[in-house]
């Protein structure tokens, strides 16, 4: 799929080492962030403010690079190729930890419950069944 505003992955992708072909990315469906149930991805993680996230990741805060990234994210397919950034290596690397909870403890002994969009609860329950 070609880059551009119609691309399902949006205008920018943040790749990181993992064994699951998962990455963080922009989206062309911004309305999903206003929904209560946002588990609409196919495994990757959509970012609501990808440009702000890119700026956060830049250790040196190089203004020219930020301008090029912004241009790359907003330009159409006829863009000035000299101003488009294709890859930026984040240095130093930023650790990324992804957790998946369907139940989460809240203050006061309450529990927040979330949809099990990946179906992991049944797998875990089957593994723990003999101990219950």
Segment roles from a protein language model:
Residues 1-132:
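Well-ordered beta-sheet/strand-loop patches within structured domains
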